[in-house]
């Protein structure tokens, strides 16, 4: 409350500030701080548990061993799928930043991969029993070797990346687009497996 005196000591003007005028600056400050705390939490990074001596990795060319004749599901040949998977893994390592890619002679780790299966399966049907959504899966076997010790760090006989796509409706997509997404999902999982499980 503020009191302002006029010429006579008996005249007083009282100015009352509404409670909302006091709360407004406090609310603004709290919103501002909350926003920056939120932004600080948005920068997700994968925490590496790699030993300090492990700094580089070489990703060998993937071998394509998918049986396109006798496989289960829908084994369609996608040209250069093994090349695309390897490139996606290398790019994911570059994006992650915990390991640098290197030539085999300079690498602390060597990752070998082999495509073992591609599958497309119906996931959801319409009321007329038409397929509405499919899931595609790319499965690989992996071996990670530590060149410093000469030992195998880990093996994964069936490591899978997957994606889904709708064949109709406003979000309709194609199998080719889903393969790209499944490849990216597989690469992300491979990198996480490599840098986290030590």
Locate each region found by the language model.
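Short polybasic linear motifs
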Residues: 18-19, 25-26, 33
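A structural "domain/chain start" motif
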Residues: 41-90, 98, 148, 192-198
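Buried hydrophobic packing residues in well-ordered domains
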Residues: 59-62, 93, 113, 140, ...
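Bacterial N-terminal signal peptides
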Residues: 28-41
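Compositionally biased, intrinsically disordered linkers/stalks adjacent to structured regions
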Residues: 175-198
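Surface-exposed short loop/turn segments
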Residues: 96-154, 161-173
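Extracytoplasmic/periplasmic, Sec-exported soluble proteins
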Residues: 73, 77-85, 103, 132-136, ...
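N-terminal secretory signal peptides that target proteins for export/translocation
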Residues: 1-22
């Amino acid at each position: 409350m503020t009191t302002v005196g006029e010429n006579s000591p008996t005249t007083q003007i009282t100015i009352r500030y509404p409670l909302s005028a006091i709360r407004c600056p406090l609310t603004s400050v709290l919103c501002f701080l909350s926003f920056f705390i939120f932004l600080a939490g948005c920068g997700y990074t994968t925490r590496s548990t790699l030993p300090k001596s492990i700094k580089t990795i070489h990703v060998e060319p993937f071998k394509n061993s998918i049986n396109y004749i006798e496989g289960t599901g829908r084994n369609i040949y996608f040209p250069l799928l093994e090349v695309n998977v390897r490139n996606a893994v290398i790019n994911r390592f570059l994006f992650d930043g915990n390991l640098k890619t290197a030539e085999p002679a300079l690498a602390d780790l060597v990752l070998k991969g082999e495509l073992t299966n591609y599958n497309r399966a119906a996931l959801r049907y319409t009321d007329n029993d038409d397929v509405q959504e499919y899931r595609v899966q790319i499965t690989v076997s992996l071996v990670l070797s530590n060149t410093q010790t000469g030992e195998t760090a880990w093996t994964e006989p069936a490591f899978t990346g997957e994606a889904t796509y709708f064949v109709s409706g406003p979000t309709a997509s194609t199998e080719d687009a889903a393969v790209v997404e499944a490849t990216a999902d597989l690469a992300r999982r491979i990198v996480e497996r490599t840098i986290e499980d030590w």
